[in-house]
Amino acid sequence: MQIRQSVKLKKPLIHYITNPISINDCANMILAAGAKPIMAEHPLEVSEITSVSKSLGVNLGNITDNKMKSMLISGKTAYENKIPQVIDLVGVGCSKLRLDYARKFISECHPNVIKGNMSEIKAIYGIKSSAKGIDVGACDIITEQNFDENIKMIKRLSMETGSVVAATGVVDIISNGTHTYIISNGCEVLSMITGTGCMLTGIIASYISSGNILEGTALAIVLMGICGELSQHVKGTGSFRNELIDNIFSISDDIIIKKIRINSY
């Protein structure tokens, strides 16, 4: 919990290049986590913005030519200045453009965290996936039958890229190739509103700003899962969205410790 309290105390500046579908919610989620968001995406200013930020998040949702330029510029700036960064592989399972770009970004910018659902993680690894648009395909969902196989793939991807790999879903798997965490928090409603994955990436970017990459990523995923559970009592998805942001802002460490479901593998 030290990471969480440090972010709230220091209020680090987080540069997050994301999509217009979720940008407002992402900025508010970063604020709720205790950090300060800046969502600059113009190619002529992003290097300057990234260089004064404490971490960088890039999100491949609703990709455009300008954002492709900007994310690569920011990613290289972050790498050169040892600024932690996370890439969210939105849609790489259904778009060759995004898949090719993500591979280029990973190769040239060396992000500290690679995040995606299992369809996206399989695609970036080079295995055929069954992505349903930007959502995970039914055949790619983690089950008891494919659990060990998926763990091995995630660990190999982490070791090959040098990045922490975060595969999110009904069960979340986070690995740096040596240490692996399995997280079982969360609820179905998180998948029923747009942008929760993008919001999570904003929290990951906030928490890895401390430099503690594996634990910061795991804590962000735990926090989103628990707050989803706490928010699902509301009458609908609109209320859920607001309740989710409120819970990220107000949840106590004691509740997190009580409700956390995490195991090492």
Swiss-Prot record:
Gene3D superfamilies in the record: 3.40.1190.20
UniProt key word Nucleotide-binding: yes
A molecular function (GO) term: ATP binding
EC main group: transferase
EC numbers for this chain: 2.7.1.50
Amino-acid positions noted as binding ATP in the UniProt annotation, renumbered to this chain: 115, 168
UniProt record, GO biological process: thiamine biosynthetic process; thiamine diphosphate biosynthetic process
Catalytic activity: 5-(2-hydroxyethyl)-4-methylthiazole + ATP = 4-methyl-5-(2-phosphooxyethyl)-thiazole + ADP + H(+)
Binding site for substrate: 39, 195
InterPro entries tied to this protein: Hyethyz_kinase, Ribokinase-like
Cross-referenced Pfam families: HK
Keywords: ATP-binding, Kinase, Magnesium, Metal-binding, Nucleotide-binding, Thiamine biosynthesis, Transferase
Cofactor(s) listed in the protein's UniProt record: Mg(2+)
Superkingdom of the source species: Bacteria
Pathway named in the protein's UniProt entry: Cofactor biosynthesis; thiamine diphosphate biosynthesis; 4-methyl-5-(2-phosphoethyl)-thiazole from 5-(2-hydroxyethyl)-4-methylthiazole: step 1/1
Family: Belongs to the Thz kinase family.
Function: Catalyzes the phosphorylation of the hydroxyl group of 4-methyl-5-beta-hydroxyethylthiazole (THZ).
Name of this chain's protein: Hydroxyethylthiazole kinase 2
Top-level taxonomy: Bacteria, Bacillati, Bacillota, Clostridia, Eubacteriales
Gene symbol of the encoding locus: thiM2
